[in-house]
């Protein structure tokens, strides 16, 4: 499976199921790559998978694709320590890969079950941009016969908040799209904030769509709970202390980074994500359970060791 086939398979997965997270599509692609790989050594197979992850990150530069790929590789690689025979080892690696994929496929439902209980009847919720996990949580709240209304930011520059509003309208949830600049104004009307995350970092902070940080700052100033919902495959080994510590490969789209290689200054480009410090986050709802920001590092160590 060469780079071109790898990229085409990844894009076809995204096209087949628009509701699928890019990280899940990447893991499905890596599993298919593993099945088709014609390498003859464990070391060679690992090297090929590492190269495939780098190729996928070149197509989709999101934090989740990077962390999901690395966690997938670590999860299946445990088999190489248990078996010396290559064919048997590869078979076990494929089985472990399929198990990993099944586990992450259940993540959103687990998170929804945990989080929707925090939504009280008659609540007003503020959310940011389009998040499949947040949408699943709100679907669970609707299924539990809870009445609530939602404010969603339009989320420039791609207006993904309007996509979220459309999805909520299909659920018959009262929803209002507000300007990104109106977050401080609208916060006093909200009872709680729920956002997704592209990545959860080692100190319990998050990397998410640009504008998340200012929403968290406003929520903290007005004593409103700020909840984050994220799957465990988004836990990434990164320890930013401020916005400048977030690597450019995560801040900008893959196409922008390719143009930047020709000499264009990235200072002229708008970042797509920002960093939100753990001190601004109330709780994180994950498929591993409900975590305080300070507990994230322990869970992250368990995942990566």
Swiss-Prot record:
Q: What cellular component GO annotations does this protein have?
A: cytoplasm; cytosol; eukaryotic translation initiation factor 2B complex; membrane; plasma membrane
GO molecular function annotation: guanyl-nucleotide exchange factor activity; identical protein binding; translation initiation factor activity
Task: Write down the disease named in this UniProt entry.
Answer: Leukoencephalopathy with vanishing white matter 1: An autosomal recessive brain disease characterized by neurological features including progressive cerebellar ataxia, spasticity, and cognitive deficits. Brain imaging shows abnormal white matter that vanishes over time and is replaced by cerebrospinal fluid. Disease severity ranges from fatal infantile forms to adult forms without neurological deterioration. The disease is progressive with, in most individuals, additional episodes of rapid deterioration following febrile infections or minor head trauma.
Could you identify this protein by its name?
A: Translation initiation factor eIF2B subunit alpha
Q: What gene is it encoded by?
A: EIF2B1
* Record organism: Homo sapiens
Q: According to its UniProt entry, what is the function of this protein?
A: Acts as a component of the translation initiation factor 2B (eIF2B) complex, which catalyzes the exchange of GDP for GTP on eukaryotic initiation factor 2 (eIF2) gamma subunit. Its guanine nucleotide exchange factor activity is repressed when bound to eIF2 complex phosphorylated on the alpha subunit, thereby limiting the amount of methionyl-initiator methionine tRNA available to the ribosome and consequently global translation is repressed.
Provide this UniProt record's keywords sorted from A to Z: Acetylation, Cytoplasm, Disease variant, Initiation factor, Leukodystrophy, Protein biosynthesis
**Any GO BP annotation:** oligodendrocyte development
Q: Which Pfam families match?
A: IF-2B
Task: Look up the domain of life of the source.
Answer: Eukaryota
